[in-house]
Amino acid sequence: MELSIHNWMRSETLETTIRRIAALGYTKLEIAGSPEQYNTKEVRHLLQQYNVSCWGSVTLMLGERNLLAKDEAQRARSVQYVKDVVRMVKELDGHMVSVVPGTVGKIVPEARPEEEWQWAVDSLKEVYTYAEESGILLGIEPINRFETYFINRGDQALALAEAVGPKCGVCLDSFHMNMEEADIYDAIRRAKGRLVGFHVADNNRMAPGMGHLDWGKIVGTLREIGYDDVLSVEFCSPLDRTPANPYPNSLDENPKDLSPEQRKFLEDHGSTAVTEEFYAMLTRKSYETLSVLL
């Protein structure tokens, strides 16, 4: 197995991120699903310069992005967005795209269950066909009930993947699993054969090793089902503005170049902009916890 990490949490240049993770020993990057922000030729050059490769990307389902929207035109725009993410990953020689079907933060349905299910299937089939032609895997990611009402558990993601296509996969996330699964390890086992990605954060969404999850057992279960690809670090530190914050210098009160989209994404995840020192600590802690298990 290898270690990858996201870059959507901190507002900094991509080179700053890549330089940091390369120095620590990471070999992969899971680039933010913002294809409009990146010149893929320049990104490829940076990755090659620091001997890091693109693992894939994760969709940022903000605003009107919703593959199961009631409005057909909205669904079409959302499909095109995910295709654009797939294209970016293809141009970066990546491997997979993790897809959250619905808008993050939307917890109220707008149609009957069977309607939304069919809209999601139809939208994902279109993306799946495009991804397969591009040689990129799709992984449907379940996230917790406080961020979406649609797909929360591995079994739900598996059912959707099976409805979409034979090579459509799932991407599990330890933080969400800790909230939604009766048994994390059984959920991993049931994903055997369809697991194309695995996001890692501890139960409190801090870096692995800063909570109570059993990382040795998680990695062992992944090996048990034959998953030997990439663990993608995706911590997202919780917002703490109280005197009880154990990391008083963690909040970046004046972040530079934080886009409205990135700010909204962090807020939807109960987080905020963090300082370079704190972010580097989380990145380092993740590597130290996981690298010895691989």
Range-by-range predicted roles:
Residues 1-13, 65-79, 109-117, 149, ...:
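Active-site mouth loops of central-metabolism enzymes
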Residues 1-7, 29-31, 54-59, 97-99, ...:
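Hydrophobic faces of well-ordered beta-strands that scaffold small-molecule active sites
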Residues 47-70, 74-75:
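Short hydrophobic interaction/assembly module
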Residues 16-23, 37-58, 87-94, 125-134, ...:
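Acidic (Asp/Glu)-rich catalytic clusters
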Residues 28-50, 58, 101-112:
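Glycine-rich, proline-tolerant flexible connector loops at the mouths of alpha/beta enzymes
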Residues 48-49, 72-169, 252, 257-268, ...:
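Active-site acidic/histidine proton-transfer and metal-coordination neighborhood
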Residues 1-2, 11-22, 151, 158-168, ...:
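Histidine-acidic metal/acid-base catalytic patches
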Residues 9-11, 35, 60-63, 103-105, ...:
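Active-site-proximal loop/turn and secondary-structure-junction residues that shape catalytic pockets
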